[in-house]
Amino acid sequence: MNKGVGIGGMFFIVIVSFLFSCEEKTVDYGFDNYYVEIVTAQNENEFLSDNGKIIVVSSSKNKNNYTAGDRVLINYTLLSEDASGDRYNVRINWSSKIPLGKLSLTNDSTINASAVEPIFLESVWLGRNYLNMSFYLNYRSITHSIGLLADSMRMESDTLRMYFIHDSKNDPPGYPSHAYLSFDLKDVLRNPEKTRQISIQINTSNFGNKIYGFEY
């Protein structure tokens, strides 16, 4: 298991564990359909998906305990659902907690001075009030620093502009490490009645230094 990433902003760094679990698991899916998504733990038996569905764990097999609010990547098989389609009873095939950070408000000078070493981006998407990412970075032995910044003086502009930062801390060349993470944006996206444009600038090794836009 990789332990090579700190997630946060310029003002706080929290050491986290990246995917996957230290214990290798072999899962026989048979002919079942299975689904993989990032969800939020509600209690030891329930998760909330980003589209509002309640996912209830009906089998203790492959079950892990998570704290309410944890972001978790789960692979599950659907066993049944209620008449409304808003509540699933599932069997967990595997799961793993993923890093959760917050947007750090700072100034333009700090943003321009921050390291933006490239990552190999798989995808970036907005789910509920979370910005989610899947990517690879080259990790060997030194903890990298990762964060999401915005200029505090421009919070009222039509578009909330955010900047993804990545500092390898001179980690020697190593191996591609696959990672998922989420940033909680609810503190800055406070008004659910008002549509807000948001963008995130990410320096990538496969697409260049690119800006991705979303509507919240």
Please name every model-derived segment.
Residues 1-10:
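Bacterial N-terminal signal peptides that target proteins for export
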